[in-house]
Structure formats: C-alpha cells, structure tokens
Amino acid sequence: MKPGRATLLALLMLAALVSACGKRGNAAPADPLRNAFDTEPDWNDATKLIQLNYQQAQGKRIFYTQCVYCHADSTPAGPSNRSNLKPVPALMNDGTVLNAESDEYLQNIITLGGSAVSKSAMMPPYGQTLTKEEILDLIAYTRAIAQPPYQAPARQGSQFIGR
C-alpha cells in the first residue's frame, strides 16, 4: 500500500517541526564581555558620562563595594563618612592628588593600608581581601575618572642608536 500525498506531506511537515525544536549546534557561544563595559557620571559635571572599559568597570564595582564610604562625598545609601575622617581621604576622582602618584604607589597603599605608607591608619589593607587583578582594576577605574584627566607618564625613547 502506497502512502498518499497528504500522508507524505504531513510526515514532511512533522519532520520539519521536530527538527526546528532541537538544539542548534551552530549557535555562537555567549560572549561574557559583550556587555561588560559601563559608564560613570563625571563627578564635576553630571551631564557628562565617562566611558569605562571592562577593567575599569570591574574597578568601579570594587570601588562601590569597598571604597565609596571614605573616598566619595556621597554613596548609594546617602552621605559618606569621608568628612568625619582625619586626615580627610582624597576623593577617588581627585586628579590633582592622585595623578601625581604612580600605579605602584597606589597598589602599595591599597594592598598594605594607609599606615604602611605614612598615611591614615583608618585605610585598611586590602591585600588579603582583593586579588592583585582587582587592585589593578581599581587603579584603572581611578585613572579613568580622574579630574583633571590622568595622563600616563611619557615613556623614554629607545637608547638604541641605529647605524
């Protein structure tokens, strides 16, 4: 007995439907960095947004969980504790203070705490709390939001003299 055209057509449509419901093997893997960047309002001009790359966005996340209460004038929860501290800590975006410091100095003060570099003992050491990568992310964020903007030191020219 031969199947009729209607039966063949129904089987073909059923096969197409079943294959459409299966997993797609050619789907591109999700890119975890695709939406990882962020922005930060300029602390001196709220109409301006500073674009952050992935590393800087990770530093922002750390800043708002670990540093905001002493290194900003306000926090997501309200006023910060900054004005109650002596000496008053630098604002995280204060380029007039922080731009003059090297990345190594900032890494040391974050890792070892304020008293290790003759600053306030109120600044705790984060070397056991944050990874080295997280500390570098935090420094990258600091550099990104600095006002005036941070200018990396110029590298010296090559000492090689061509013939």
Predicted regions and their residues:
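Electrostatic cytochrome c docking/interface patches
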Residues: 25-62, 152, 158-163
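Sequence context surrounding c-type heme c attachment/ligation sites in exported
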Residues: 57-68, 101-105, 129-132, 154-156
